[in-house]
Curated annotation (Swiss-Prot):
Described purpose of this protein according to its UniProt entry: Transaldolase is important for the balance of metabolites in the pentose-phosphate pathway.
KW Transferase (keyword) present: yes
Catalytic activity: D-sedoheptulose 7-phosphate + D-glyceraldehyde 3-phosphate = D-erythrose 4-phosphate + beta-D-fructose 6-phosphate
Single GO molecular function: transaldolase activity
Keywords, comma-separated and alphabetical: Cytoplasm, Pentose shunt, Schiff base, Transferase
Record Pfam families: TAL_FSA
Similarity remark: Belongs to the transaldolase family. Type 1 subfamily.
Subunit (UniProt): Homodimer.
Cross-referenced InterPro entries: Aldolase_TIM, TAL/FSA, Transaldolase_1, Transaldolase_AS
Source species taxonomy: Bacteria, Pseudomonadati, Pseudomonadota, Gammaproteobacteria, Alteromonadales
Main location: cytoplasm
The name this protein goes by in its record: Transaldolase
Pathway: Carbohydrate degradation; pentose phosphate pathway; D-glyceraldehyde 3-phosphate and beta-D-fructose 6-phosphate from D-ribose 5-phosphate and D-xylulose 5-phosphate (non-oxidative stage): step 2/3
Length: 318
């Protein structure tokens, strides 16, 4: 019998949630996703020192201002890591916009254009890139404009149905609804343990998937942020699942049979009229878990971006 990972691949596109090139080579995913925390982690791998040096030298060639150099080096390093990953995966790389821009639509669009241009200068077409944005109202509005330009987006830090619905109505290419972080919140809030089938994160993604398929939305659902393989197995059949190296390893060493749990709708019905900003903000605000986890996620990504910039500043100043 094929291992669990190989059983999953025919029914769900497997994406590697890592910047570790060796892990990507090992598990042969279709796509890969990165974020500021993963870029920070990857920057500490000795084999990546040339990518950092290249980013530093490029940043110095672009400006004499240290703060601008730090920003440029961070963008170039994220793209350099993406370029290495694209040598391995046949599909796409997701590269994230600075989390500190999560409430600034105009700045998010400008950063997306800069990242796409850096990939273009390296010979990579935008069709192989997904721009990652936080699922704030401003991030969703930025994604709507980028999608209209033909730049596909991956809306991340998604914890609620309101966020998912707004993304679909904006014509976003892909969403990354989080599973494990939802489970974390409910376990802390209730003190309960949950089976994989009852896992609040699994229930959330299943609900979003079914809504999209029932209403004929083309937005891809890519479950993310897993705490265990049980969550992954319960979401077999989801459009895509982005999985970290430790759980990819566990799945490849397992022979648990896979049963497709998520199935496309046999017929579709018309969706409701699109949400207004006021409606989105109210419905999102009604979900304390989503409010807390989105804010926490943005803060944590911003902290890791800051740590990366401290490292880059030291390199630029040496």
């Amino acid at each position: 019998m094929a291992n669990t990972l190989e059983q999953l691949k025919p029914i769900t596109t497997i994406v590697a949630d890592t910047g570790d090139i060796e892990a990507i080579k090992r598990y042969q995913p279709e796509d890969a996703t990165t974020n500021p925390s993963l870029i920070l982690k990857a920057s500490q791998i000795p084999e990546y020192s040339d990518l950092i040096e290249n980013a530093i030298n490029w940043a110095k060639s672009q400006s004499d201002d240290l703060e601008q150099q730090i920003e440029d080096a961070g963008d170039k390093l994220a793209v350099n890591i993406g370029l290495e990953i694209l040598k391995i995966v046949p599909g796409r790389i997701s590269t994230e916009v600075d989390a500190r821009l999560s409430f600034d639509k105009t700045a998010s669009i400008a950063k997306a254009h800069k990242l796409i241009q850096l990939y273009k200068e390296a010979g990579i077409d935008k069709s192989r890139i997904l721009i990652k944005l936080a699922s704030t109202w401003e991030g969703i509005c930025a994604a709507k404009e980028l999608e209209q330009e033909g730049i596909n987006c991956n809306l991340t830090l998604l914890f609620s149905f309101a966020q998912a619905r707004a993304c679909a109505e904006a014509g976003v290419y892909l969403i990354s609804p989080f599973v494990g972080r939802i489970l974390d919140w409910y376990k802390k809030d209730t003190g309960l343990e949950y089976s994989a089938a009852e896992d609040p994160g699994v229930v959330s993604v299943t609900s979003i998937y079914n809504y999209y398929k029932r209403h004929g939305f083309n937005t891809v659902v890519m479950g993310a942020s897993f705490r265990n393989t049980g969550e992954i197995i319960e979401l077999a059949g989801c459009d895509r699942l982005t999985i970290g190296p430790a759980l990819l390893e566990e799945l490849s060493n397992s022979n648990t049979p896979i049963i497709q749990k998520l199935l496309p709708a046999t017929e579709t019905i018309a969706a409701q009229p699109a949400m207004s900003e006021a409606q989105f903000r109210w419905e999102f605000n009604e979900d304390p878990m989503a409010v807390e986890k989105l804010a926490e996620g943005i803060r944590n990504f911003a902290v890791d971006q800051g740590k990366l910039e401290v490292m880059l500043k030291a390199e630029l100043s040496s």
